[in-house]
C-alpha cells in the first residue's frame, strides 16, 4: 500500500521552510512585542553567561524554531486529543513556573535553583510527550538543548544574582513575564 500523502508532504515542507527562517524577523511574525522583549533579554543573559554570541543565538534560534513547529502542528490540527491534553499540561506547568520565577524575583532570599531547574526539566519532558511523534530527532535535540541551557543551575544562579548585568536582565525578563501572565500569553 502506498503511504504517500500530499497533506503530510505539505506539512513537512512547511516545517522545513519555517525552520530555516527562524530569524529575528520571523520572531516578529510569530510572537508579540512582550515575548520578543523577553527573548531578547534571555539572549543577552545567555550571551553574558556563555561569553559566546554564537551559543546565545543558537539557544534562542532553537527556541524560536521549536515554537514555530509547534504552531504549525497546532494550526494544521496534527495533534490528537491525548497530545493536546499533554500540551495543556505543558502550558499549565509553564504558567506555574513563570509565577514561581516572578515570586523568586520579587521576594528576597526565596530563590531556589533546584525548583526552577526541576520545573524546566518537567516542561521539557511534557513537551517531548506532547509533540514527540511529530518531530525529527534534530528537533528533539533542539528541545533538549533549550531546556538543558535554561535549567543549568549555574546559569540560574547567575541570573538571580544581585550582580549586574544579570540583575537588569532578570528585572526586564520578569516584567515581561508579568505582562504575559496578565494578558494570558502564558
Curated annotation (Swiss-Prot):
Biological process according to GO: negative regulation of TOR signaling; regulation of apoptotic process
Keywords on record: Cytoplasm
Tissue-specific expression: Detected in wide variety tissues, such as neurons in brain, hepatocytes, germ cells of female and male reproductive organs, muscular tissues and variety types of cells of the epithelial origin (at protein level).
Official protein name in the record: Tumor necrosis factor alpha-induced protein 8-like protein 1
Gene3D superfamilies found in the cross-reference section: Tumor necrosis factor alpha-induced protein 8-like
Transport recorded as keyword: no
Example of a GO MF term: identical protein binding
Keyword Cytoplasm: yes
Pfam families the UniProt entry points to: DUF758 (PF05527)
Amino acid at each position: 500500500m502506498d503511504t504517500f500523502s500530499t497533506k503530510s508532504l505539505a506539512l513537512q515542507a512547511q516545517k522545513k521552510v519555517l525552520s530555516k527562517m527562524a530569524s529575528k524577523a520571523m520572531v516578529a511574525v510569530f510572537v508579540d512585542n512582550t515575548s520578543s522583549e523577553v527573548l531578547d533579554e534571555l539572549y543577552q543573559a545567555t550571551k553574558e553567561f556563555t561569553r559566546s554570541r554564537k551559543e546565545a543565538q543558537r539557544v534562542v534560534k532553537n527556541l524560536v524554531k521549536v515554537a514555530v513547529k509547534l504552531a504549525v502542528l497546532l494550526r494544521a490540527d496534527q495533534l490528537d486529543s491525548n497530545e493536546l491534553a499533554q500540551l495543556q499540561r505543558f502550558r499549565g506547568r509553564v504558567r506555574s513556573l513563570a509565577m514561581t520565577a516572578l515570586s523568586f524575583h520579587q521576594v528576597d532570599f526565596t530563590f531556589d535553583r533546584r525548583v526552577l531547574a526541576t520545573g524546566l526539566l518537567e516542561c521539557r519532558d511534557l513537551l517531548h510527550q506532547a509533540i514527540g511523534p511529530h518531530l525529527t530527532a534534530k528537533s528533539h535535540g533542539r528541545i533538549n538543548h533549550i531546556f538543558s541551557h535554561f535549567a543549568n543551575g549555574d546559569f540560574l544562579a547567575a541570573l538571580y544574582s544581585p550582580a549586574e548585568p544579570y540583575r537588569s536582565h532578570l528585572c526586564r525578563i520578569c516584567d515581561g513575564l508579568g505582562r504575559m501572565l496578565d494578558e494570558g500569553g502564558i
